[in-house]
Amino acid sequence: MVYLKRPYFRKSRSCPLAQCPDEDIDYKNRALLSKFVSEYGRILPSRITSVSSRKQKLLARAVKRARFLALLPYC
């Protein structure tokens, strides 16, 4: 019996922050940052949120600053 591989089609998902300029990703914008942080306080990876690598770096930096200033919890 011959097993055939199923073709894998990856859905192309666009970055949810594509329309958002880089200045809007700010450590003071808690509403935006809380969308990309899990319920345990961890930063969600870009493979789950489908954020581009540039925006992911900006998000991570903003979340870390917000944590340091006690705007977001560490856990």
Swiss-Prot record:
Alphabetical keyword list: Ribonucleoprotein, Ribosomal protein, RNA-binding, rRNA-binding
GO cellular component, one term: cytosolic small ribosomal subunit
A GO MF label: structural constituent of ribosome
Signal peptide location: none
Subunit structure as annotated in this protein's UniProt entry: Part of the 30S ribosomal subunit. Forms a tight heterodimer with protein bS6.
Record family assignment: Belongs to the bacterial ribosomal protein bS18 family.
Protein name (database record): Small ribosomal subunit protein bS18
